[in-house]
Amino acid sequence: GDAQDSATVDVLRQFLTEMRPMLEAIDSTSGQGDVLRRETEALLDGLKRHQALFPEDPVPDVVWMPSGFNFALYPTPTCLAVGLDWFMGPTQPLLEELPPSQFPQYRLNRMKPEWMASDAMKGWLLVTHQHRIPPGARTADLMLFWGQIMHLTSLYMPNATPAQLLNWTSEEWAWAEANERAIWAQVQPQERMFNDNPREVMRWFQEGPFTRVGDIPQESPDKLGAYLGWKMVQAHTAARGDLPVDGWFMAQDPQPFLRTYRP
């Protein structure tokens, strides 16, 4: 409304009153000067590495902002907005007021300030390359896509641990490493590897407390399809040491990657 209208002023005052606790929480956590400097430097370094490998791609402007818990990341080809309220730390008291149906404990546990840059880098790559996912994508297709994204993110964010890049704890990463062959045995059957039922395929890649597929136990971490895809891409690039980045990152046929992966 009109800036001179008293009703408009009242609405703005109400908005500021409602936002104040969130802004104060951000200022003491993810929005602290040293935290933002550290995460900005890491993210910009990652984007510079991307530009060196893919000079034709536009580099997005990075915007740190409160989102009102509407989004953690809002990536476009030219802008990468990061919701600071999603990275205030899992022990921030304000998070206790969020509805558990939308913010379950596993999601709260991942709201770490030190994950802002790596989450933003990975999220930007996922969104800007999602057009490469083929229609009727099979489990194998999404394993390749996620593996490519994870491997490229790891090159751009060399100081991030593998567990961090998957939004896992170190214990969850250790579990996956110890059970890699058993996980592979669950996805290897043709009816799972080349399944194109979206609901069944996404069980391997969606966020959750664990991976809800077959005989995989509840102590497993989520997104085990992304984990196996990453392992698959790592195995392929190791076997093809002369392969340039665009040679494996832009590939869309999972078969050569499946052939070189032997857990």
Language-model features and meaning:
Residues 9-173:
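Acidic/His-rich structured neighborhood in mature extracellular/periplasmic domains
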Residues 140-263:
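A cross-kingdom marker for long, charged
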